[in-house]
Amino acid sequence: MDIDPYKEFGATVELLSFLPSDFFPSVRDLLDTAAALYRDALESPEHCSPHHTALRQAILCWGDLMTLATWVGTNLEDPASRDLVVSYVNTNVGLKFRQLLWFHISCLTFGRETVLEYLVSFGVWIRTPPAYRPPNAPILSTLPETTVVRRRGRSPRRRTPSPRRRRSQSPRRRRSQSRESQC
């Protein structure tokens, strides 16, 4: 079977393969990030989103893999064979888990569309010959250039006055903003 764990999310293994292996944080760092940001949702009996479900499954599979690795480390007496198993897990299976965890954490953090746009733009950048591409790779950020941020509770202005047409030279008063969290 040819199963692509990213297909239902609009991505592919190939799309993630454009990112170099050293791009992805360690599994430990990714697990810590997932716990810090999404512990309540991941431990909740409620269904939050397909990304939460995929993240739960990846975390559980990683735990099972570590249990197997501990068993192999304890029961495989030949040090050379043990090192081969550890090396294989770290380079192949570990990378797949790092990619999977990074993808779902990033989709939850930045939004699926932003992550997909990033993967496509990075893929285009990396395949463009160095002489014809910008020196810096695209950066995944929370606010893509097309995003418009508006304050809560205020209607959008019809037009924004240009800085040259300012009516008053006196300092502006600042409105106090509540520090409520916005989800």
Curated annotation (Swiss-Prot):
Ranges for region Disordered: 136-183
Modified residues (Phosphoserine): 155, 162, 170
Region (RNA binding): 177-183
Gene Ontology BP term (one): microtubule-dependent intracellular transport of viral material towards nucleus
Renumbered ranges of motif Bipartite nuclear localization signal: 158-175
Subunit structure: Homodimerizes, then multimerizes. Interacts with cytosol exposed regions of viral L glycoprotein present in the reticulum-to-Golgi compartment. Interacts with human FLNB. Phosphorylated form interacts with host importin alpha; this interaction depends on the exposure of the NLS, which itself depends upon genome maturation and/or phosphorylation of the capsid protein. Interacts with host NUP153.
Chain residue ranges for the region called 3 X 8 AA repeats of S-P-R-R-R-[PR]-S-Q: 155-177
InterPro entries: Hepatitis_core, Viral_capsid_core_dom_sf_HBV
Species: Hepatitis B virus genotype D subtype adw (isolate United Kingdom/adyw/1979)
Keywords, sorted A to Z: Capsid protein, Cytoplasmic inwards viral transport, DNA-binding, Host cytoplasm, Host-virus interaction, Microtubular inwards viral transport, Phosphoprotein, Repeat, RNA-binding, T=4 icosahedral capsid protein, Viral penetration into host nucleus, Virion, Virus entry into host cell
Protein name as it appears in the record: Capsid protein
Repeat region (Sequence), residues: 155-161, 162-169, 170-177
PTM summary: Phosphorylated by host SRPK1, SRPK2, and maybe protein kinase C or GAPDH. Phosphorylation is critical for pregenomic RNA packaging. Protein kinase C phosphorylation is stimulated by HBx protein and may play a role in transport of the viral genome to the nucleus at the late step during the viral replication cycle.
Ranges of Basic residues composition bias in the record: 149-176
Compartment(s): Virion; Host cytoplasm
Gene Ontology CC entries for this record: host cell; host cell cytoplasm; T=4 icosahedral viral capsid
Function per UniProt: Self assembles to form an icosahedral capsid. Most capsids appear to be large particles with an icosahedral symmetry of T=4 and consist of 240 copies of capsid protein, though a fraction forms smaller T=3 particles consisting of 180 capsid proteins. Entering capsids are transported along microtubules to the nucleus. Phosphorylation of the capsid is thought to induce exposure of nuclear localization signal in the C-terminal portion of the capsid protein that allows binding to the nuclear pore complex via the importin (karyopherin-) alpha and beta.
Sequence similarity: Belongs to the orthohepadnavirus core antigen family.
A single MF term (Gene Ontology): DNA binding
